């Protein structure tokens, strides 16, 4: 099995990033068979689809790399690298744009969500970035791609592109990847102030999220003030229906402690959230405090972060080279 996945270097990482992607990667790495390979990359080319500050982007790349390592990604067991350091990503993306169909991209719901009412002002990169995502995984002959529900459509696009290319040029060049979806009860962590909105760094209220750099005291304050409702904890998951804030806190506790929604409710049903929140705070502090300390250490050694990313890029290029060389040969191109 070869797993490939990327994350944009956004900076200001929060609990949603940790539970939604990073810890899933760590579990996959730690549970891997000896023959499995895992490639995790910082998707800095994807970050260019919106306006960027180059200096901030460079800082965010190091920050994200440090956070991944602090969370448990081991560069000796997984290949960790910066997307733009492997030029084959961009090369293959252009090749695949010539295979992908406009109708396929027009159906991508994330472009509609991200461009909003300003579709005419959105960049071409934002429209076409699912093709770059396809290149990211097809380049390495990925067999499995861990994605959230909101990204499943893009993996289906990658499969369609791989199948069309293989069929058009009578080749078996590209492995058709399988999506690996889910994994954890809090894959979608919601805002602490609005249970219907995802936890996000773009929310103007810092009280809406748990940052990975938050102190123990800040975590306690945010959970204490997190929005809930006056009803007690139910005994069954169905009792959380129509209670998004309650469901969010229960889901976070389950994910952080390795339990399930059912087990959390079995232990805490009948309690008010005033009694439940201290337990949630303790669980979050136990998870984040050691990660935060390790992150601070890594921040102080930028040269080591750069070395790890460079070594990872060297390994990634070795795996990428056969695919791009064969793609050019099949197309009649010279490289």
Language-model segment annotations:
Residues 10, 142, 205-207:
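Short, solvent-exposed beta-strand edge segments and adjacent coil->beta transition regions
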Residues 60, 88, 153-154, 245:
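An acidic site on a long C-lobe helix of protein kinase domains
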Residues 116-165, 169, 191:
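Internal, conserved structured core segments that host functional sites
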Residues 102-106, 139-146, 254-264, 292:
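Short helix-capping/linker segments at secondary-structure and domain boundaries
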Residues 15, 153, 159-335:
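Conserved nucleotide- and phosphate/pyrophosphate-binding catalytic cores
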Residues 2-135, 283, 296:
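N-terminal Rossmann-like or analogous alpha/beta NTP/dinucleotide-binding catalytic cores
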Residues 65, 72, 100-103, 142, ...:
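A generic secondary-structure signal for well-formed alpha-helical elements
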